[in-house]
Amino acid sequence: MAKQTFEMTFEGRPLVVEVGQVAKQANGAVVVRYGDTTVLSVAVMSKKMATANFFPLQVNYEEKMYAAGKFPGGFSKREGRPSTDATLTARLIDRPIRPMFAEGFRNEVQVINTVLSYDENASAPMAAMFGSSLALSISDIPFNGPIAGVQVAYAAEDFIINPSASDKEVSHLDLIVAGTKEAINMVEAGAQELSEDIMLQALLKGHEAIQELVDFQNYIVAAVGKEKAEVELFQVDADLKAEIEAVYYDQLAKAVQVEEKLAREAATKAVKEEVLASYQERFAEDEDKETILRDVVEILEQMEHAEVRRLITEDKIRPDGRRVDEIRPLDAEIDFLPNVHGSGLFTRGQTQALSVLTLAPMSDTQLVDGLDPEYKKRFLHHYNFPQYSVGETGRYGAPGRREIGHGALGERALAQVLPSVEEFPYAIRLVAEVLESNGSSSQASICAGTLALMAGGVPIKAPVAGIAMGLISDGTNYTVLTDIQGLEDHFGDMDFKVAGTRLGITALQMDIKISGITPAILEEALAQAKVARFEILDVIESAIAEPRSELAPTAPKIDSIQIPVDKIKVVIGKGGETIDKIIAETGVTIDIDEEGLVQIFSSDQDAIDRAKTIISDLVREAKVGEVYTVPVVRIEKFGAFVHLFNKTDALVHISELAWKHTEHVEDVVKVGDMVTVKIIKIDEKGRVDASIKTLLPKPEKNEDGENGEEHRHCCCSHHKPDHHNESVEAPKKSDESETKE
């Protein structure tokens, strides 16, 4: 195929698609140019059905550092494992694409997106989502798209589609919505406590833009699309299914209605094992034994799926006996752990999450280096899902895509209520440990995170709670479920997570298994979630009504001091020598920003005070008129040097020692004497003159109107020589040995 180019203008930027020039051996490939962002999207499919009992779809999103004119970090100086942002973007693309393949499709499919050129004002993730859908749509892969996605911002009471970098800075909303021309099928959002009405408007506004992008894709597919390949779909033997249903359906249906999770799992497992054992014995010598047994396992899964959905839609009975809008039993507890900076334990039915708070100096913020300009990330929310939480053994290691995604959702939900750096100058890390799970563990981690933040004394604006909504739909009728458990998530059509405060929504995430949902379903789910959210907030606030006024004793305390910018180098010292010495002596952590704000962290207040005094002395400057009680550190013929602070000394000229004539400096002061002096002069070089006599009573004048002694031996200050320049004179800044005397 020769290169073909298609172009439209979308939201004020050119959107150009090139087909037929690159990656021609793949099933489908497109180059998408949006503004100055360029993404190559490629789709490939295996020739045969995979043996897995699921659809093996893999979506990758690769950020090449050259796309932004940047050099990769690290020793190898090349791209390594995907960044967290790249992993989250891959999930964003996967989620709206996955429902668009036929039931029973088991061929392996890979969709690879490579960012080749990056423009921060033209969304690369949205270009990649568009390119992924289009690469699948023009290929011979049987994909029931196209889909598209857009980013929506909200500022000045207006919605902005695919906002620029400057638009994002002032936006109260960061929403990504994807779908087909007919309906929405994926949502991901962070919001600053926006109402359900505004969120719904944003979703509908985004869907309008999606329709325009889908039309453009359909136009391209009509021009260059390949005929779809004939692939084998996984199907069970119809006669075998009818036979098993006739004998075992009622038995399995009864097991499904056992309310407690572990007991229900044991009951359904017993039925399935009985059926499987029967057919293993029956077909022990059959050459198609493996295929038959595989079908038996799939049929039993389909039977359980059908009965759970029938109970909810027809009988309005949920597996655990709840009403469709009923939340499982709730419990909230703080201070579960000693010696940490804050902890919260949240339990909802058989789902339980422990959240642990750690506070640290701002120097511990995470440095994020991707295609965007490098920045520091202050708040981290990490989510861990060990296999024991569901009573199973399994792999332990680095977090997978699911854990990264759930952690990011909690981070978005809670970030909206955190105090500013000016109000609370700490780096903040929350770790959610899922201890038990029967669905909605990500939302439990948000609730536990709220408890940990408030218990740890972080002055959040308001508590945040999260709830997961579900959907069972037969295409005509539907039922929206509040607080879905694992079985309802597994066999249901939607997982719609809503987090927020009493004022509004802070995060949304929606995944579905059908092609899309209507605005009416969205509206009902949001309204039902609001009621549930308030009920959960009541329980959270019964455990702790507001953030504690003080940090935990183990948490680092903080004090700050503002220093002149030109004094930063004084505090740091050559090669960091001075600041390292302060840290070693006091045990504190010190952060200094480019504007001279010095922040001192330690769990020991005395250590903070010592460090603050040292720094204050380092940058302190004497002022005319100030009075000090200080030691004499040096004697010269022309006067005495006194140590004011740090490395700053002052000269008390011999004429400023006393009102009467002084023949020898030692007649008045000696090294080591503590004297009270007043600063009388600071010259243009910063040299300091002080006086003792100005603080003493002045002698009465004689009959001639003069002070007798002073008149006979006049040594007036305005005529006295500049002894600061004499070779025997110690400099204004004494060495450290003198300072310590």
From Swiss-Prot:
For bias kind Basic and acidic residues, which ranges apply?
A: 698-713, 723-741
Q: Where in the cell is it found?
A: Cytoplasm
What's the catalysed reaction? Answer: RNA(n+1) + phosphate = RNA(n) + a ribonucleoside 5'-diphosphate
Q: At which positions is Mg(2+) bound?
A: 489, 495
User: Where does the UniProt entry say this protein principally localizes?
Assistant: cytoplasm
Domain (S1 motif): residue spans on this chain: 625-693
Which SMART domains did the record assign? KH (SM00322), S1 (SM00316)
Q: Which UniProt keywords apply?
A: Cytoplasm, Magnesium, Metal-binding, Nucleotidyltransferase, RNA-binding, Transferase
The chain positions of domain KH read: 556-615
Cofactor dependence is on: Mg(2+)
Region annotation (Disordered) maps to 695-741
Q: Single GO cellular component annotation?
A: cytosol
**Cited InterPro entries:** ExoRNase_PH_dom1 (IPR001247), ExoRNase_PH_dom2 (IPR015847), ExoRNase_PH_dom2_sf (IPR036345), KH_dom (IPR004087), KH_dom_type_1 (IPR004088), KH_dom_type_1_sf (IPR036612), NA-bd_OB-fold (IPR012340), PNPase (IPR012162)
Alphabetized Gene3D superfamilies for the sequence: GHMP Kinase, N-terminal domain, K Homology domain, type 1, Nucleic acid-binding proteins
Could you say which enzyme class this protein belongs to?
transferase
* Cited HAMAP family: PNPase
NCBIfam families of this UniProt entry? polynuc_phos, PRK11824.1
Q: Which family does it belong to?
A: Belongs to the polyribonucleotide nucleotidyltransferase family.
Tell me, in a sentence or two, what this protein's role is: Involved in mRNA degradation. Catalyzes the phosphorolysis of single-stranded polyribonucleotides processively in the 3'- to 5'-direction.
- Specify the protein name: Polyribonucleotide nucleotidyltransferase
Which species is listed as the source? Streptococcus thermophilus (strain ATCC BAA-250 / LMG 18311)
